[in-house]
């Protein structure tokens, strides 16, 4: 029987892994869902699969009560649980909408398999599990180029650690910079640093040699991940490794740094490569006396690998980190990310453009004159991109709520009245900005002293 403290630690690790994995899957699902048209059944079904797996991980994490983890982590678990409950309902709503558009068919390969989540074992060491989810259909059939066969990518890499990392390779998709609304300064900086050097490498040498570490920071829900994907999409033959913090961690001493080493070796074998690490602050925060030996050794290995990458003129590698807490990153880590770009909430013009784009893209009928659009742009001050998407979804439901169940049953979508400014006003009572002004000012102050902003 496990000691109570070890059981509490095990419960927390199980919760945290499920939390991180659910967040990653749902974020990936939303990205695919939002950029694909309603006629793109293949991509919509991929998004559905992401949502289903995300829901299972949400439910797995929510089964663990805060009082079952060790005391110093209970407030964190409570906070995450509240957010997960909201996200779970939102994800179920998205999945339900897609299932109505694309009913399940017999003998489809995209049928979802139960999540095989492995709780960390305290009693005996096992091989580190880099990814505890089943491989999604999006990543299952990776189309490697001739130079990027599995054997070539794993050259000089322990398959035990490198094999699961290959599942993080994303196939090139059609996300482009032009698909992203707002964030003009960030897009321009990324184009100069990443995209243009691939067009004419000889021009970008010497003092014009691009940075190999970029930090995207800003409030959540403003497209940091989508920007990184757009960079990979614009670069054509570049391999894109989308690595979560959970994929780089292991509680067994010695394994975490081997995972980091394997990651960079795979990136070198398949270069040019972009390594994208979301929530980088969760694994590379400032070093202190209380951190574990595992964490300290992993950070040291990451620094060594970054130094090796920066000192080599032959390596065509780029590491992009994303965080909403840049001030918590270790100073030595920050030095490896000389390009630090604030991804702020959209301004009035970008907010209006995003709202109108969503309405038009989804073929949602609306009645908004020029003056009303300007009013709506002013009302939504402080809303993030994801907040605006949620607001549009809520506003689209208002006309339906005016109808009886009988009316809804016999109504076709084209007969539904258009969305008005009043509908958005009602929706704003339910959908509030997820980012407070205090957080924004803190991030902008950081950008003014240590980063780049508009």
From Swiss-Prot:
Protein name, UniProt field: Probable spastin homolog Bm1_53365
Keyword set includes Glycosyltransferase: no
Location(s) in or outside the cell: Cytoplasm, Cytoskeleton; Cytoplasm, Perinuclear region
Highest taxon in the source lineage: Eukaryota
Organism: Brugia malayi (Filarial nematode worm)
One GO CC term, this protein: perinuclear region of cytoplasm
Task of the protein: Severs microtubules, probably in an ATP-dependent fashion.
Keyword Isomerase among record annotations: yes
Keywords for the protein's UniProt record, in alphabetical order: ATP-binding, Cytoplasm, Cytoskeleton, Isomerase, Microtubule, Nucleotide-binding
